[in-house]
Amino acid sequence: MSKELLHSIINREIVNEFGRKVGQVVDLVIDKKSGRILALVAKISKSEELLNKLTKDERGNIYIPMSVISITKNEFQIDEKKIRLIILKRKTTQKQES
């Protein structure tokens, strides 16, 4: 099992699949029961239209689910196709509830 200290994760870069920096980690969302990391809380550029459609906290940081993230030695890489699917599913659910 690979281990890493929290302070080495905070401020780590988040890049897209082409290696372009899209933001940085500012916090984590952890399941209290299992201890699993559920999402990264990230500070991103306002120009990141796709990522800005994800859930945000009161400071404008976004929650990126771990299901769309690959971890490399020095950064977190997001899969924008998976993010689009999450956003599409959320829109579909909202329409059905209306």
Where are these regions (language model features)?
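Peripheral interaction segments used for macromolecular assembly
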Residues: 1-98
